[in-house]
A protein has these predicted regions:
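Core subunits and conserved enzymes of cellular information-processing
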Residues: 2-230
């Protein structure tokens, strides 16, 4: 069936979906901030950013952005779609985490209970952020595209368990870089996969089933919409 969407409707649709994705990504950044402030060892991805920022004169957020664009290259090789959501993810999570860190609202935890609770809250929040921004179907972020791409190669394995293996591999690199590794880091490797399965299961969400729009599809839709007028 021919697309009759006008260009103004196309813009409103993509802007609305982009705004929805941005909200989800800021929720994700908040979860990353919680994990840092848990002071219990970070998630492997955060630990990787921290390790790079420790070895080079760049901020945590900048390191996060650099890593994101490197992974985008890997995603392209895996033929995962790269779209508006991918670019937003690469920029907003790192920048958003820096914003929350600069605000300093949540103090670093010093007790075992405090560390554990804040870490678990951070993991749950990041899962919710993943769900929200991925539902916009504007393509996954670099890390999530990598996760989904690997998950498609093992369709019978729950995505959380695929994530667990991926995080374990990232943690090996973190160890080499001298990133801080604590009990919380180990909990993140195994806990993130488990919590992902629980949260996504509760929301009845399967990221591998989503049909994402890549940049070529977005441009094609824009071109078609222009033909239909404003």
């Amino acid at each position: 069936m021919k697309n009759t969407e006008t260009f103004s409707k196309f813009l409103l649709n993509r802007l609305g979906r982009s705004a929805f994705a941005i909200v989800g990504l800021m929720v994700f950044a908040l979860g990353s901030y919680f994990q840092i402030q848990a002071n219990f060892g970070m998630s492997p991805w955060n630990s990787l950013s921290q390790g790079i920022s420790m070895n080079y004169p760049i901020t945590f957020g900048t390191a996060n952005i650099i890593i994101s664009f490197i992974i985008i290259g890997i995603d392209i090789l895996m033929r995962e779609p790269i779209g508006i959501g991918t670019i937003l993810n690469a920029i907003i999570i790192g920048a958003g985490t820096d914003v929350f860190l600069s605000m300093g609202v949540l103090p670093q935890q010093t007790t075992f209970i405090g560390k554990f609770v804040v870490l678990m809250a951070g993991i749950v929040i990041t899962c919710l952020g993943q769900y929200l921004y991925m539902k916009a179907c504007l393509s996954c972020g670099p890390r999530d595209s990598l996760l989904v791409g690997l998950g498609k190669k093992f369709p019978k394995v729950k995505i959380g368990y695929v994530n667990m293996v991926l995080l374990a591999m990232v943690q090996v690199v973190c160890f080499i870089l001298g990133s801080p590794v604590g009990l919380g880091t180990v909990i993140c490797v195994f806990g993130t996969g488990t919590i992902t399965n629980i949260v996504f299961g509760f929301l009845k969400f399967e990221p591998r089933a989503l049909k994402h729009e890549g940049i070529p599809e977005t441009l094609a839709a824009a071109k078609e919409a222009l033909k239909n007028g404003f």
